[in-house]
Curated annotation (Swiss-Prot):
Belongs to the eIF-3 subunit J family. One of its GO terms (cellular component) is eukaryotic translation initiation factor 3 complex. Residues 11-21 have a biased composition (Low complexity). One of its GO terms (biological process) is formation of cytoplasmic translation initiation complex. Keywords: Cytoplasm, Initiation factor, Protein biosynthesis. Residues 1-58, 71-97, 201-242 are annotated as: Disordered. Residues 71-89 have a biased composition (Basic and acidic residues). Component of the eukaryotic translation initiation factor 3 (eIF-3) complex, which is involved in protein synthesis of a specialized repertoire of mRNAs and, together with other initiation factors, stimulates binding of mRNA and methionyl-tRNAi to the 40S ribosome. The eIF-3 complex specifically targets and initiates translation of a subset of mRNAs involved in cell proliferation. InterPro entries: eIF3-like_dom_sf, eIF3j. Pfam families: eIF3_subunit (PF08597). This is Eukaryotic translation initiation factor 3 subunit J. Component of the eukaryotic translation initiation factor 3 (eIF-3) complex. Its main location: cytoplasm.
Length: 242
């Protein structure tokens, strides 16, 4: 027999059973050993681009056209038509303003700027005549200037309203004379009386010019005859003197 030492004999090692990491039979996902593990990167999504102002304007124009087309399909009253036209004009003005100022937000941006803008100041009150310096005379030359300015304006009213002007002149003169004293009123009356006499002479002269030419010629002939006889008498007196 051969010796046991002559052959190498290896004793098989007993397999050690694997000890489960968990005592439960359910399988679980392995926990990451480190919290610093890198997260998977996400693919970049598509970038959003801001629509150009012209695109918003085209959309607004298309909207207006659709509204106008829809309004044509049904009858509308005058008030609705005016409101629609006014709104269309307003939208058109807003679009023109947007193109002019180059707003990035199109019509909406222009509208927002218009709302944010301060309200315009109220119009100034109209000037009164009493605010003019000419109606505040202080010296005699100032009153003369006022008279020369107002008189032509007021007297021209007689040309357009000859029936109403006399009453106006009387009441206006009375209103102007109200602050005057008695002596000043007498002077005013005397001035008016003198002016009245002047007017009477002018009217008589005007009536005399309207007489018939035949009567005027006959009157002139009579005067000529009278002058001739007088001349003869004077001539006889001259003979007596000689």
């Amino acid at each position: 027999m051969a010796s046991w030492d002559d052959e190498d004999f290896e004793v098989p090692a007993a397999a050690t059973p694997a000890v489960p990491a968990n005592w439960d039979d359910d399988e679980e996902e392995d926990v990451m050993d480190s919290w610093d593990a890198e997260e998977p990167t996400k693919a970049p999504g598509p970038k959003t681009t801001v629509a150009a102002p012209k695109k918003a304007q085209r959309q607004q124009i298309a909207k207006i056209e659709r509204e106008m087309a829809a309004m044509k399909l049904k009858p509308e009253d005058a008030s609705t038509k005016r409101d629609r036209q006014r709104q269309a004009e307003l939208d058109s003005d807003m679009m023109n303003a947007s193109e002019l100022f180059g707003g990035t937000g199109g019509i909406a941006d222009s509208a927002a700027k218009a709302e944010a803008a301060p309200a315009p100041a109220a119009p100034a009150a109209p000037m009164k005549l009493s605010d003019l310096a000419i109606f505040h005379p202080k010296e005699k030359k100032d009153f003369t200037n006022l008279k020369e300015t107002l008189a032509p304006i007021l007297t021209d009213l007689n040309k357009t309203s000859p029936l109403a002007y006399p009453d106006f002149a009387i009441t206006f003169t009375k209103a102007l004379a109200e602050p005057l004293k008695v002596e000043q009123l007498r002077k005013l009356i005397s001035t008016l009386n003198a002016y009245q006499n002047e007017k009477i002479r002018e009217e008589k002269a005007a009536r005399g010019k309207k007489k018939k030419p035949g009567l005027a010629a006959a009157s002139a002939k009579i005067n000529d005859d009278k002058d001739t006889s007088t001349f003869n008498d004077n001539f006889d007196d001259f003979d007596d003197f000689m």
